[in-house]
Amino acid sequence: MSILLEKIKTLPPNPGCYLFKNTKDTIIYVGKAKNLKKRVQSYFTKRNNLKTAMLIEETQDFFYIITNNEQEALILEANLIKTHTPKYNFKLLDDKTYPYIEITKEKHPQLKISRFKQIPPGKIIFGPYPNLKSTKETLKLLHLLYPLRRCQLASKKPCLHFHINQCLGACAGKTINYKPNIDAITKFLKGNIKDILKKLHHLMQKASEKMFYEKAQEYRDIIDSIKQTTKKQLISNQKLKNCDIFAYAFNQDQIAIQILKIRQGNIVDSYRSVFSYVGFVCENILTYLNCYYQKNIKPDIIITGKNQDENILQQTITNQTLLEQILQTKVNIYHKGDKKKLFLLALKNAQNDLSHNNLIYQSKDQKIQEALNKLAIIFNKDIKRIDVFDNSQLFGKAFVAARIVFNHFEFDKKLYRTFHIKGELPNEYQAFEETLTRCYNKGKEAENDATDLILVDGSLVQLRQSQKTLKKLGYEIPLGALQKNNKHQLTHLVTFQEKLMLEQDPNLFHFLKSLSEEVHRFAVSFHRKTKKKLDYKTTLSNIKGVGVVRKKAILNHFESLEAIKKATLQDFQKIGINQKLFLLIKKSL
């Protein structure tokens, strides 16, 4: 939780969408905010209802996408919820769609509000508009100023709207030229509202001067509706069907990548990454995009724009053809229009990620360094690499152990190791002795020379046993034990000299807790795989007619019991199993 609170401090005050993730890296909630920092902070600082409390309890991390205004954030929120279907979002899971204003393509066209799950080609539409009330008010104004057909043509007499000058008379059999009104409506909905607003302000002022305050308020509401409805939207753009908007920002140490994914005219997702680089920025970006699109579906077109550095821009243009050849998709650099605005939105997010990533990781590294400094004092040695051990078993079955390595401010997964503990019923002390022996025996010196501290799971007794084992192997490495309570919660750091209560040092506690949780995760994950394989072998051993040779053949050919259940007779015949034994195996499972 403290890490999340630190991350919240770096949030921008911009409008946008925020996405909460759980420990499995699954998006569990999407929200929108006028002020990202205030909104996300409110979840963690205010008293919440039960549902919100459950959300916060499950939240492990979050990320966000900046938008230009709250209206864009609202539309983006809907797109993201439909894409990710988060468990804590309900309102938008029913395929809710936002309204559009449509001019129908008929001999006598209508102006109406329409909704689409997927927009049919060829329609004249404007939107989407997240505020239905404002959309209705705007439609009402357009009917008043630029009337089209509002009646059913089946009627043989003029409609009511014709009598109040809001219908041009199709119902009365008149020949009508709709083009001037359609052009005026189109111009208005594309944002050219200056003349109308000027007229409405004049009418509002006149009504106010005559003390017709209700009428003046009515004009005021119409003006607000027009401004709301005609606000330029970037989040939905029906001219862009299937493209990625790519932007990046960089400094001397890191590059931030931002990719906005547009599908069917809507921004449905974003991808972001901040990474350290060596060499030239442009070359790193080319390599990165090549790797990214090998794993992800390529769009019809990748759109980018002018970068912060003119030299980088020239390199990008030079490499444009190369990038197109590598990715087998079109790459365009835009300098104006909506595509440029979308690029600038992606660039804004990339720049924000870059600046705040520095703040987050500087703060994180600083806290880790403080914890390492405290450990250096405790063990009287500079600490850079820490080896952490844990084991996992179920009633003595599938007894396994694991080692993780924390090295130079990060987990070094290349040095992670797992061990199957031998023997029928080993205890924890025997398990650790075997693990340490196999991990630090002769021939492993190069791998373990840099170890500054070893942490084991247990108490002072475990610490002494581990020290004896290491001395036999010729190692003099400082040792500590991570002691937990009966709820498996970390409480103390045990050394040969003292037993430190970690709650008195929150910084050290959070650091050691992260090590403890990582080694526990790694050990339990390996234990589950081992247990599953053991159950698999046991099940096969209990089937009459499956001896050692056949069992080995089945184990080598099929990865799991699930694979056997799905297998056909032909699959078994490939390894010499006849139909009779095949049916017996299937029946036994």
Swiss-Prot record:
Gene Ontology terms describing biological process: nucleotide-excision repair; SOS response
Gene Ontology CC: cytoplasm; excinuclease repair complex
Key words of the record: Cytoplasm, DNA damage, DNA excision, DNA repair, Excision nuclease, SOS response
Domain named UVR: residues: 194-229
Domain GIY-YIG stretches: 13-90
One Pfam match: GIY-YIG
Location in or out of the cell: Cytoplasm
Transferase is among the record's keywords: no
InterPro entries: GIY-YIG_endonuc, GIY-YIG_endonuc_sf, GIY-YIG_UvrC_Cho, RuvA_2-like, UVR_dom, UVR_dom_sf, UvrABC_protein_C, UvrC
Xref: PROSITE patterns: GIY_YIG, UVR, UVRC
Coarse class of the protein's main subcellular location: cytoplasm
GO MF entries: DNA binding; excinuclease ABC activity
Quaternary data: Interacts with UvrB in an incision complex.
PANTHER family in the record: UVRABC SYSTEM PROTEIN C, UVRC/OXIDOREDUCTASE
Functional summary from the UniProt entry: The UvrABC repair system catalyzes the recognition and processing of DNA lesions. UvrC both incises the 5' and 3' sides of the lesion. The N-terminal half is responsible for the 3' incision and the C-terminal half is responsible for the 5' incision.
Family under the similarity heading: Belongs to the UvrC family.
Designated name of the protein: UvrABC system protein C
Organism: Aster yellows witches'-broom phytoplasma (strain AYWB)
Top-level taxonomy: Bacteria, Bacillati, Mycoplasmatota, Mollicutes, Acholeplasmatales
